[in-house]
């Protein structure tokens, strides 16, 4: 690279490649960082990836295996590799933007909590929302939310990340934004499972709505704002992920509902690792998450789908909240 990039995008999967292509196509200096030199060389040569069929990487997009210094580094690696990836970044004071969605399996930590531990001196933001990678990559219109506690830095970064086809809203609640993006994957598995088992659209709508309520409860318990979950980071992302056929978590649920194993070759299914970690975090705060508990037990083989649905339906009746 002859000049330092404006953006370094760590992770050359579908989401990282889509973001890198989006910003490179806008004339930004962008470096896409693959996990090893072999993959980087292949991407640099072919300018294509099987993760995003039909997309050709912009000629200006640099591809490398070594993370460069950059004013803004977007981390789009599978969530369970976030801590390791942060440990390999070059020293610097550039802003970190967390683009992966999940909860750390071992600790139950959210992305902003991991970043605060690993890189306490760096500004950190969460970029999330209802965004399928393939649609972003080809420039279809979309909206996202950029969550960061520093008001001035957030306003500047929103301007930096918005494009004519991606509208970016600001939020001062990175915990709520991160939790909404992580937990919706679990609820999407539940939604897919009931459709796969032929239990109907009513059941899916009920699970999505009650799943949203339990995400909001945990958000408040962790110090976030419940209203964050009614926006793009929560409701918007949940609607897309729990109904869209391109959602890996929804498709995993469909497979479970049909008595099959999910296809893990198409990409990481974050909700599978997130469910038990999220449930443990909820229990530690005394927060009830019955849908998440049902998904966790279903994934572990401790309960059948029919039994889990009966357990949810037979909970004590009460006012909705």
From Swiss-Prot:
It is found in: Cytoplasm. InterPro entries: 6-PGluconate_DH-like_C_sf, 6PGD_dom2, G3P_DH_NAD-dep, G3P_DH_NAD-dep_C, G3P_DH_NAD-dep_N, NAD(P)-bd_dom_sf. PROSITE patterns: NAD_G3PDH (PS00957). Its EC number is 1.1.1.94. It holds the Pfam family NAD_Gly3P_dh_N. Catalyzes the reduction of the glycolytic intermediate dihydroxyacetone phosphate (DHAP) to sn-glycerol 3-phosphate (G3P), the key precursor for phospholipid synthesis. The active site is at residue 184. NADPH binds at residues 15, 35, 101, 133, 248, 268, 270. It catalyses: sn-glycerol 3-phosphate + NAD(+) = dihydroxyacetone phosphate + NADH + H(+); sn-glycerol 3-phosphate + NADP(+) = dihydroxyacetone phosphate + NADPH + H(+). One of its GO terms (biological process) is glycerol-3-phosphate biosynthetic process. Sn-glycerol 3-phosphate binds at residues 101, 129, 184, 237, 247-249. It is an enzyme of class 1 (oxidoreductase). Pathway: Membrane lipid metabolism; glycerophospholipid metabolism. It comes from the Bacteria. This is Glycerol-3-phosphate dehydrogenase [NAD(P)+]. Its main location: cytoplasm.
